Amino acid sequence: MKISQLAQLTQASTCPRLVVKVGSALLVGKDGEPRREWLSALVSEIAAMRAAGQEVIVVSSGAIALGARKLGLAKGGRGSLSDAQAAASVGQIALAGLWAELLAQHGLTAAQILLTLEDLEDRRRYLNVTATLGTLLAACAVPVINENDSVATQEIRFGDNDRLAARVGQAAGASGVLLLSDIDGLYDRDPRQPGATRIPVVKGVTPEIHAMATGGSSSGLGSGGMTSKLQAAEIAELAGMALAIIDGQPVAPIAAAMGAARGTLFLPRGRKQARKAWLGGRMRMRGSVQVDAGAAAALARGSSLLAAGVTEVDGDFQRGDAIAVLGPDGRTLARGLSEYDAAECARLKGRHSREHEELLGYAPRSALIHRDQMVLL
């Protein structure tokens, strides 16, 4: 059953597996100490959901904020990358211990997983994450996941846990993702402006929806804002998952949001094949090719991408790398795994397939990107 209402996210029958993301500003107070009473109430909610047959995965921020206080670092540990890495090293121990302690009070076992962007961009490592999550959930454990900030560099960082939550949900085969935020959903303009209206349901993250995003995290403790939440919603949408943004500030925030039906629900598309869902959720492209109108129309009909329709090649990518396919207007039409490296694509662009063997010096492949290795956006 496809999720169409906010309350269905907390029902095992409609959402048998749910990812709950908790931000730094909710978990850690301005004094740098964990908000134990608030977190204890949230854990009670998670325990009740688990008892009702719903599997729950937690994506928890807070390690940097917790570690920064212990180390006496300014700016919440975010003054520099090295500060953030050091703070995370200390804070991860405290964060994992806190979750383990509170979950144990309900007879639940916490399992810590630390991930970097590369863990979910590389297909083999992604499948390993999928297998680990499946085993933990089958054993009735509650996975508690965070970005591995102690080793992640700018190049291999998610940068926020909103998108990490969506990618984890995709890897776990979850039906929904619940983002606990410091705001109760997406508004049609800056919610501080008079007349701002919350949007209860979004069907498709369009450019108009993106235009409604405002600013970053207001607390200074986290790294995510509405823009990152919309990017997470796009990942979820492509993977066939529902995603909701709710106000995480009340005690027992999930019950409060569901009882009042207050939040923004992003509706899912239909489920994709696992490989295409992984590809659609990838956040880093190695390059791009631009195509003409004829090729764009052929892609829309479900065809593979042929080199004859390519007009431009950009980036330094290898065969098998993920690249974006841009339309004549520069808009991203698809993502796919290239059958050629960038230099070969540049030689083949605009040329008919009968010319390819002479240009390459070997028997060509059937397409520049095969339709089975491509997802339309």
Curated annotation (Swiss-Prot):
- Identify the residues that bind ATP: K21, S181, D182, S223, G224, G225, M226, T227, S228, K229
SUPFAM superfamilies membership: Carbamate kinase-like (SSF53633), PUA domain-like (SSF88697)
- Listed pathway(s): Amino-acid biosynthesis; L-proline biosynthesis; L-glutamate 5-semialdehyde from L-glutamate: step 1/2
Query: If you read the UniProt record, what top EC class would you report for this enzyme, in one word?
Result: transferase
Q: Which Pfam families match?
A: AA_kinase (PF00696), PUA (PF01472)
Q: Superkingdom of the source? A: Bacteria
Localization of this protein: Cytoplasm
Q: Which InterPro entries match?
A: AceGlu_kinase-like_sf, Asp/Glu/Uridylate_kinase, G5K_ProB, Glu/AcGlu_kinase, Glu_5kinase, Glu_5kinase/COase_Synthase, Glutamate_5-kinase_CS, PUA
What is catalyzed by this enzyme? Answer: L-glutamate + ATP = L-glutamyl 5-phosphate + ADP
**Which UniProt keyword terms apply here?**
Amino-acid biosynthesis, ATP-binding, Cytoplasm, Kinase, Nucleotide-binding, Proline biosynthesis, Transferase
Under the heading PROSITE patterns, the entry gives:
GLUTAMATE_5_KINASE, PUA
Enumerate the residues binding substrate: S61, D149, N161
The EC number(s) this enzyme carries: 2.7.2.11
This protein's GO cellular component annotations are: cytosol
- For the PUA domain, which residue ranges apply? 286-363
GO MF annotation: an example: RNA binding
- SMART domains, per database record: PUA (SM00359)
Single biological process term from Gene Ontology: L-proline biosynthetic process
Homology family? Belongs to the glutamate 5-kinase family.
Its biological purpose: Catalyzes the transfer of a phosphate group to glutamate to form L-glutamate 5-phosphate.
By what name is this protein known?
A: Glutamate 5-kinase
Origin species, per record, is Novosphingobium aromaticivorans (strain ATCC 700278 / DSM 12444 / CCUG 56034 / CIP 105152 / NBRC 16084 / F199)
